[in-house]
């Protein structure tokens, strides 16, 4: 099964790097004019994603993007969605844990747990505080839960496109992102005898860590860095779009009305 996971901030020329804790809308003066026009948005939805008002897809509009994850859990519980499933993530941010501590927490003894036990873990401790699944790491949690079988990141061309945790890549390797789609692989790993390597660790240390690590199945991770290379036929089982109010100006809210024309809200 395949789900479309949209974020409203993809339809902007200027990308905000707002701290997760900030809840205010973006300033109209700086961000308002960067929002795509209605015609451009409709063209992308219909010509790039293959959506149609004549064959609407069940879905939901949410506020914070981590609510997409809870929507999927709801669908799984109701038997409407089966896992693992493919995710097409159209966003200005990868939401794979960069800027969070979750990649270290998830690449831990948790990987030794049965899947049923993993899925009961909803938070972790970092610097004396309890952190929960958030807007910046919910996809990484989905991978750790083995909910996601394949992930395609349709990245905003104006963003960095490699805003994920390097240490979650298979063999600590990533293909360079330029102007064409790139295929990487995410593979969570844990070696109880060694600390997780950092980017500048020696290759010998990285190889030793990998040799003694337990490893989750690899997940194909495709990054599409341009709008022109986004090509889908609309064959999605479900659609979810996040408003992401702290990453969009209020003037962008008309996008939600447009999306509603292409989905059957559930």
Model regions and ranges:
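Conserved alpha-helical scaffold segments that buttress catalytic/binding sites
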Residues: 2-266
């Amino acid at each position: 099964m395949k789900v479309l996971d949209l974020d409203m901030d993809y339809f902007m020329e200027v990308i905000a790097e707002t701290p997760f804790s900030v809840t205010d809308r973006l300033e109209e003066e700086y961000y308002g004019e960067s929002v795509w026009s209605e015609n451009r948005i409709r063209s992308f939805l219909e010509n790039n994603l293959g959506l149609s008002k004549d064959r609407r897809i069940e879905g939901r509009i949410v506020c914070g993007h981590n609510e997409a994850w809870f929507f999927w859990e709801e669908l799984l519980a109701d038997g409407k969605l089966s896992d693992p499933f493919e995710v097409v993530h159209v966003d200005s941010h990868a939401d794979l844990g960069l800027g969070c501590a979750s990649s270290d927490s998830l690449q831990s003894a948790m990987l030794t747990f049965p899947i049923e036990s993993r899925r009961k873990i909803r938070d972790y401790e970092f610097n004396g505080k309890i952190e929960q699944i958030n807007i910046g790491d919910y996809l990484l949690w989905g991978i750790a839960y083995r909910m996601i079988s394949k992930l395609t990141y349709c990245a905003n061309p104006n963003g960095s496109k490699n805003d994920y945790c390097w240490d979650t890549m298979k063999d600590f390797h990533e293909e360079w992102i330029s102007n064409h789609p790139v295929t990487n692989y995410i593979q969570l790993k844990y070696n109880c005898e060694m600390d997780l390597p950092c980017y500048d660790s020696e290759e010998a240390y990285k190889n030793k860590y990998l040799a003694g690590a337990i490893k989750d199945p690899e997940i194909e991770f495709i990054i599409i860095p341009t709008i022109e290379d986004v090509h889908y036929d609309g064959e999605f089982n479900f659609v979810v779009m996040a408003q992401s109010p702290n990453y969009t100006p209020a003037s962008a809210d008309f996008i939600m009305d447009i999306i509603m024309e292409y989905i059957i809200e559930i």
